[in-house]
Amino acid sequence: MTERQIYTVSAEIAGRTLTLEAGRFAEQADGAVVARYGDTMLLATVVCAKEAREGTDFFPLTVDYEEKMYAVGKIPANFFKREGRPTTTAILISRLTDRPLRPLFPKGFYNEVQVIITTFSIDMENDPGPLAIIAASAALAISDIPFAGPVGAVQMGHLDGKLVVNPKMGEIEKSRLDLVVAGTKDAVLMVEAGAYELSEDEMLQAVIEGHAVCKQICELQEQLVQLCGKPKRPFTPPVVDTSLEEAISAWMGDRLRKAVRSPVKQEREAQTEALKAEVIAHFTADEPEEEIPNRTKEVSKAFEKLLKDEVRNAILDEGIRVDGRALDEIRPISIEVGVVPRVHGSALFTRGQTQVLTIATLGSPGDEQKVDDLGIETTKRYIHHYNFPPFSTGEIRRLGTPRRRDIGHGALAERSLYAVLPSEEEFPYTIRLVSEVLSSNGSSSMASVCGSSLSLMDAGVPIKAPVAGVAMGLITGEDGRWRVLTDIQGIEDALGDMDFKVAGTANGVTGLQMDIKTTGITYEIMRQAFAQARAGRLFILEKMNAVISAPRPELSIYAPRIMTIQIPVDKIGALIGPGGKTIRNICDTTGAQIDIEDDGRVFITAPDGEAAKKAISMIEGLTREAKVGDIFLGKVVSIKPFGAFVNILPGKDGMVHVSELDEKRVENVEDVVSLGDEINVMVIDIDRNTGKISLSRRAVLTGETPEARKAAGAAPRPRPREEQRGGREEPRSLREELRGPRRDGERPRPRRRDD
């Protein structure tokens, strides 16, 4: 057995070492690279099928990002102690890795390719997302799989007014920008970002500076290829039968143009499918029966190529889109809010034939989503879910768990709105948005952004500004010409070269996602796309503001009411009670839900304000500390010749001296109060040593404040000896309790030292 050869290359990126290593792991994979940045370490493997599956007419690329709990020194908490289904983070990183790799495989290459990225170590400082792209690209680059890479990837932040390369995880939480850019040495391939209203120029500058770092990472991968790269397997793109295309084009005449140029998706699809059926029937009529299936595929492929050319050439040559719009024109928009009864907020956003209904639901802090990514437990108080049912495109498909696409679109809409949400201190509710795509003809994710902003305002959530989104497209020609399209629809997305989604407020960008189908785009194209996106966004915001321009002043009557109080940390146990008995009693009595934070904040979520106030009263009764000047409605629990003892808080009594019972002189305590009476009393003094509380009914009756009493020279009355000895009555000793009361005439027994 030959000795294993290990190859390593390294470079300094943003003050940390990026290392790529091949030859140590997974030798039977077509390509395997370990990428390490700091102490974050990933293994990427790639395997390609030897032949394409028969009948396959698409590129079957699969990218899986596998999170392993051992990477953070944890054991899975489930019953089987094994990793389960992919987390949302794993799915998003899988999609993030797939998008810049896919355009770099040759056209017509239909062999199945599987990329698996496995987490070996996560250091909680360096984001594994960009590193996953680098590792996968390097594995493909050194393999024999046809691939026009390598691809570099980098994360960009914006801290203290400056762009930062690969900010650490703790820093990204404070950053105004979280952007991942990937590209080859020649062009940008993919951008994904969330931002706090950055300008288009700032976003583009972040992409440009990030791409410069990507070039360095590409050079590092090229060094690894020189050390251990395999020769690429031969691949010959399928030969296109242009004569068949020419024959079909001549036979159809201008019928394809007429069929394509219909503003209604269903009509356009019906007309093109009918024409396609005629073409297939005509060009397979003379074929032997056994050749008809193959001939049908050839004719169908040629027809689809002509359809694509017709759509693209009309845009490049004439500036005409299939629905007759100008290149920068947005489809007709209609907006409704409050369309669903009893929900907390709702909005129906329709743009062309894309229609999204977004529902907002407000919940208690206890409704926050608990997230456990690689053993790091966090919570999310804002959640966005995106649903894309089959009827939205007139199709039949099995329903089940959300697909990767649904999760990705939901995450994009979620981060696009994050910048305008109120803080937990301003608005302590948990917020869930659900976008139901009811009809789709392109840009449903951006329609979800618009619908979400509208539904939040309808629900009364105090967002900082409305947010709108629009998707831009791109058509390029072989002669270098290009056209950017505003508000692309389905056919333009499918047959175009770019999907460039921009969301934001009137002040700046809050969300960005760019995917392309070519080998890269230039900064000039991106600058034009940003400019058209801003114009489109402002147009849409104007339409939205005409319906609802600010959050409603009141929450829905069906939304819960949340009130917040602060209790001493040492009172948390008293509020919870033994085994949670006390807090459960409050919840059962009032119908409220109570959530307690470690810092003593208590959130009371109730169906109405009265229930919340009742719960607060009960909580304060358990946790409130008496202070001088506080007024309580107390209950008389004991009467003595020198005054009355009044219970003001659970387990806390104070004494009202006879001189403090009334404005006038009181000879007999029971002339003023009786046992069980409820009276208003003010705390006038708290003994620093014993904690005993002096109360005054007279101060409440006269409206006298503690400050006024002090200025007038009034002092708390001295406590009588009986009260000073310890409360209502001095407790008897155990011997006295056992001895019982003395009989009449019995002399007291002398006390012993041990009594």
From Swiss-Prot:
GO terms for cellular component: cytosol
Residue ranges annotated for the KH domain, each copy included: 560-619
Highest taxon in the source lineage: Bacteria
Cofactor: Mg(2+)
Enzyme Commission code(s) on record: 2.7.7.8
Location of the region described as Disordered in the Swiss-Prot/TrEMBL record: 704-755
Record carries keyword Metal-binding: yes
Biased amino acid composition, Basic and acidic residues: 719-755
One GO MF term attached to the UniProt entry: polyribonucleotide nucleotidyltransferase activity
GO biological process entries: mRNA catabolic process; RNA processing
Location(s) in or outside the cell: Cytoplasm
Pfam families the record matches: KH_1 (PF00013), PNPase (PF03726), RNase_PH (PF01138), RNase_PH_C (PF03725), S1 (PF00575)
Keywords from the UniProt entry: Cytoplasm, Magnesium, Metal-binding, Nucleotidyltransferase, RNA-binding, Transferase
Principal subcellular localisation of the protein: cytoplasm
Binding residues annotated for Mg(2+), in chain numbering: D493, D499
Function: Involved in mRNA degradation. Catalyzes the phosphorolysis of single-stranded polyribonucleotides processively in the 3'- to 5'-direction.
UniProt name for this protein: Polyribonucleotide nucleotidyltransferase
Organism phylogeny: Bacteria, Bacillati, Chloroflexota, Chloroflexia, Chloroflexales
